[in-house]
Design a protein with these regions (language model features):
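A conserved ligand/cofactor-binding region detector
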Residues: 1-815
Length: 815
């Protein structure tokens, strides 16, 4: 790299890596190798590997700046990036070299990798999708960066105590984060509260409280390329230090009160919003992210171009869900108040810059903020939102002069339930593109949630089906299957997943079938070891591993899975000597800390597991395990081991899902409803290679319209009746027999909102087909191979190419 001085680039030989790791341990960490612990060796290794990426990173950044390319800025409240060391080694192609270097130093790479804390910067699919997208942006050499919050405590650590979820703080920074660079000089003031002072036609936002946002950068390496990108995370810092006067008077709590209040903004991911103060903190958190980010984007732009007149040509800002939608009024505010744009001019630029991904159609999950709260915390932004709404409704009224209902339905301000700002509405009105994340979801989005907007802005809406990065989810997570693929179709599938289709030519070869089966068994043994170590439950790796791992939520219907587990238990109890296909039902996932019903479902799973796993009649025929503290790194162990992937959400509720893709990519067969991306997976793998059951989205709606009566299903279906009665009468919790009465009531007497009982029989019958097929291992593996071969479409590389072409209008950087 050109520099005004000479320097030696770090080299990649085993010998150089050994020197580098030892040097970092002694001179960066300041530790004697004789007494260094695993964490210190891990950090030394991370520093040594980071050094080998920095040059690429600086070169990429310099190329983006010198070529003056249009850049995308991807805003997300969550980034679940997973462990960084193993991914970096894979990207650089030095996995074996580092392993050998550490071996020669008497250290084990796998042990060090397991020491790394997962950065807990997300909750579920939203954050993992954002991380896959950053990986693909870098691998494709596209100019972009992610922006998020550097939470001190990530999604809580989940412990299971007496069957119940217990949350404890997840201090992922406990041993530092060598992967990041703190940018002491990149800091912005973020303001809250205050009032608006009118000066003629101009508004001034005055008397505000201020906190500082300080930048921390992480390198996002592209795979097998010099291209890298940046994830910039903001940490909150008090604008004034402690109150020394109060401290010296001995009032220590008061001395640090303001500082703590300021820094709470980046303390925890998604503070519990069941209280007013919790909701207010969440709003502050969202604004903290967007204010620092938009200021940074404008600062970077001006440094490069010395003008804001070409802003719309050079930047694209993408909103991952509604959490960062406040960046719309923030950009307007900065352009008008700080950079002297006229309102119309600022609005035109804003409309050209923003695009938005919708991730849910469920009304309870769509963000709205009370006008009163927004007015108190962000008065200037509320004023701008009112102005945007006024402008939009006036334009609409000219086109539809007598349609008051339409104006009411499309107004950004919802007047019907206590005056609330609808964030999704704001995003749709201003963004130049709005996308859904699967064909079904995008169709439902324009037919239901945004039907009025789709009629007003027909060219605004499009579909971009989600994808996953094959680097982390196949190459890294499943080395044994990757080896089989490399041997038969070559190695370049890592950057062109469509090449998996070449596996079709090998499907009828017994040796390949055997190799794929052997790889699966190796992965199942690895997971069985984890289960034995963590839960003290011994499972048979040759049993069918039936897996549902995702956030615990009623719409994802873990409850229906449990009903099938109990049905299976009852059948085995009735005839213990029959030839049952042995199964291990594996659950993992966190319930939001304030979500009573989801936590109740976790408790039920563990109660059921306790009874089944200790029943001598059952033995190895059925085991149930709930693996606590689900994370990216745990998923990388569970997914390759799955035989059956449970994707059983009520049709029309899951926008896309990405675990469905990860499982199929790793050779699991899917049992699922026609929901989210399952629909497109069915089209790609063929209906004979996937287990589909249950009502379609149209049938779900039709059932609602007719008046769904869950009690009828309960009364007509003997097995269902037995299962629900057992749960209600305390068979699985005799010490507290009434524990799940409310849960059973919600299904039978209170509407069964997610239609578990309506799909139960279809689901159980479909599970019988799964058993029948599993008794023919070659045929099962043939279908698994067809799934793998047809997963090429579901790469996040394809997804990002579609975003780049149809939404962001960005092109790769020349390196």
């Amino acid at each position: 790299m050109n520099a005004p001085f000479t320097y030696a680039s770090p080299t990649l030989s085993v010998e150089a890596l050994k020197h580098s790791i030892a040097y970092k341990l002694m001179f960066t960490i300041g530790k004697d190798p004789v007494i260094a612990n695993k964490h210190e060796w891990l950090n030394a290794t991370l520093f040594a590997v980071r050094d080998r990426l920095v040059e690429r990173w600086l070169r990429s950044t310099r190329a983006q700046l010198s070529q003056e390319v249009r850049q995308v800025y991807y805003l997300s409240m969550e980034f679940l990036i997973g462990r960084t060391l193993s991914n970096a080694l894979l990207s650089l192609g030095i996995y074996e070299d580092v392993k050998n270097a550490l071996d020669e130093m008497g250290l084990d790479l796998e042990e060090l990798i397991d020491e790394e804390n997962d950065p807990g910067l997300g909750n579920g699919g939203l954050g993992r999708l954002a991380a896959c997208f950053l990986d693909s942006l870098a691998t494709l050499g596209l100019p972009g960066r992610g922006y998020g919050i550097r939470y001190d405590y990530g999604m809580f650590k989940q412990n299971i105590v007496e069957g119940r979820q217990k949350e404890s703080p997840d201090y992922w920074l406990e041993y530092g984060n060598p992967w990041e660079f703190k940018r002491h000089n990149t800091r912005y003031k973020v303001r809250f509260g205050g009032r608006i002072q009118q000066e003629g036609r101009k508004s001034r936002w005055v008397e505000t409280e201020e906190i500082l946002a300080v930048a921390y950068d992480q390198i996002i390496p592209g795979y097998d390329t010099d291209a890298t990108n940046t994830l910039r995370l903001w940490n909150a810092q008090a604008s004034s230090a402690i109150n020394l006067g109060k401290f010296n008077q001995g009032d220590y709590f008061a001395a640090v009160e303001d500082k703590n209040h300021s820094e709470n903004v980046s303390r925890v991911l998604y503070p519990d919003d069941s209280t007013y103060s919790g909701r207010e903190l969440r709003l502050r958190q969202e604004y903290f992210l967007v204010s620092a980010t938009v200021q940074d984007i404008l600062h970077r732009h001006f440094q490069l171009h010395q003008t804001y007149s070409n802003l719309a040509d050079k930047i694209a800002i993408h909103l991952n869900d509604t959490h960062p939608v406040l960046s719309i009024p923030e950009l307007m505010r900065l352009l008008i108040d700080e950079h002297k744009f006229e309102w119309d001019e600022a609005f035109e630029v804003t409309c050209q810059v923003f695009s938005y991904t919708n991730h849910t159609l469920m009304s309870e999950a769509l963000e709205t903020w009370p006008v009163e709260m927004l007015g108190k915390i962000l008065p200037r932004h509320l004023q701008i939102i009112f102005e945007i709404n006024d402008y939009f409704l006036k334009t609409l009224q000219e086109q539809h002069p007598n349609d008051i209902e339409l104006l009411s339905r499309t107004s950004i301000i919802d007047e019907s339930s206590g005056r609330r700002v609808r964030m999704a509405w704001l995003a749709v009105v201003v963004s130049h593109k709005v996308n859904g994340v699967s064909e079904l979801h995008s169709n439902l989005m324009v037919q239901s949630l945004f039907a009025d907007f789709a009629a007003i802005f027909p060219m605004r809406f499009l579909n971009v089906t989600n994808g996953v990065t094959p680097r982390r989810w196949l190459a890294l997570a499943n080395p044994s299957l990757s080896e089989v693929l490399d041997e038969h179709i070559g190695r370049t599938w890592r950057t062109d997943l469509s090449q998996l289709s070449e596996l079709e030519q090998h499907i009828d070869f017994p040796a390949v079938n055997q190799a794929v089966r052997h790889a699966k068994l190796e992965n199942k043994k690895r997971l069985a070891t984890v289960i034995a170590q963590q839960l003290n439950v011994v499972v048979n790796p040759k049993a069918l591993f039936d897996v549902q791992i995702k956030r615990i939520h009623e719409y994802k219907r873990q409850l229906m899975n449990v009903l099938h587990v109990i049905t299976r238990y009852n059948r085995i109890k009735a005839d213990p000597t029959a030839q049952w296909v042995p199964r291990v039902n594996i659950f993992a996932g966190k319930a939001a800390s304030a979500y009573y019903m989801a936590k109740h479902i976790i408790h039920l799973i563990n109660d059921v597991a306790q009874v089944i796993n200790n029943d001598p009649d059952i033995g190895d025929k059925l085991k149930v395990v709930f693996i606590p503290n689900y994370s990216v790194s745990l998923a990388q162990v569970i997914i390759p081991a799955a035989d059956l992937s449970e994707q059983i959400s009520l049709a029309g509720t899951e926008a896309s899902g990405t675990s469905n893709m990860k499982f199929a990519l790793n050779g699991a067969l899917t049992i699922g409803t026609l929901d989210g991306a399952n629909v497109e997976m069915l089209e790609h793998v063929g209906e004979e290679n996937i287990f589909i059951f249950g009502n379609t989205a149209d049938e779900v709606e039709e059932l609602r319209r007719q008046g769904y009566k869950p009690r009828e299903y309960y009364e007509k279906d003997e097995e269902l009746h037995q299962v629900l009665t057992q749960i209600a009468t305390g068979l699985f919790n005799p010490q507290d027999p009434g524990r799940y009465r409310d849960l059973v009531d919600s299904l039978i007497n209170f509407g069964d909102h997610y239609q578990v009982l309506a799909d139960y029989r279809s689901y159980v019958d479909c599970q019988d087909k799964v058993d029948a097929l599993y008794q023919h291992p070659e045929e099962w593996t043939t279908k698994a191979m067809r799934n793998i071969a047809n997963m090429g479409y579901f790469s996040s590389d394809r997804t990002i190419q579609e975003y780049a072409e149809h939404i962001w209008n960005i092109k790769p950087v020349r390196l």
